[in-house]
Amino acid sequence: GFGILRYNTMLTVKPAAVAFANMVNNYRYLKPIGKYLAKDRKTYGFIYENEKESGAPVLSIWREADEKEELIPVKYTKSLTGVDIFGRTIEIPIIDGMAHLPLSMSVLTVSGFDMDDLKNLYEPKEQY
């Protein structure tokens, strides 16, 4: 059937319902501030400020196709946490000053960045 519930005796939710609930949970306090400047033309992303957490930056990032690791140089960031569309969290490894983000066609929401590490990695919203 159509919709976000399966038509069975339990009315179980479909994956889209879980993804939507997680999207609302992860993005409801975020204000977009710019477009991520990816090195690869098949990688897309946006930078947000979390208004609930004093403007802490959040990166939303994904690939058009395939899977690939995105390396982001970080000097001030100490740890990063990624959340997939189903709400599963992963610790993003930082090795020798590079954050290693595992990308796929599914959106990864990454928090924990120091804004000084992102300031040259996005195009401000008013410019696009």
PLM features: residue spans?
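Short beta-strand micro-motifs in enzyme catalytic cores
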Residues: G1, T9, Y44-F46, P57, ...
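Aromatic/acidic polysaccharide-binding cleft in carbohydrate-active enzymes
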Residues: G1-N25, G34-R41
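Hydrophobic, well-ordered secondary-structure elements that form the walls
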Residues: F20, L59, V110
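Hydrophobic alpha-helix feature that most strongly marks membrane-spanning transmembrane helices
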Residues: N25-R28, E64
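Short, hydrophobic/aromatic-rich segments at coil-to-beta transitions
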Residues: Y29-G34, A56-V58
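Carbohydrate-binding surface patches
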Residues: A38-K78, I85
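Surface-exposed loop/edge segments in extracytoplasmic proteins
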Residues: G87-P93
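C-terminal beta-strand-rich structural cap/linker in extracellular carbohydrate-active enzymes
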Residues: P93-Y128
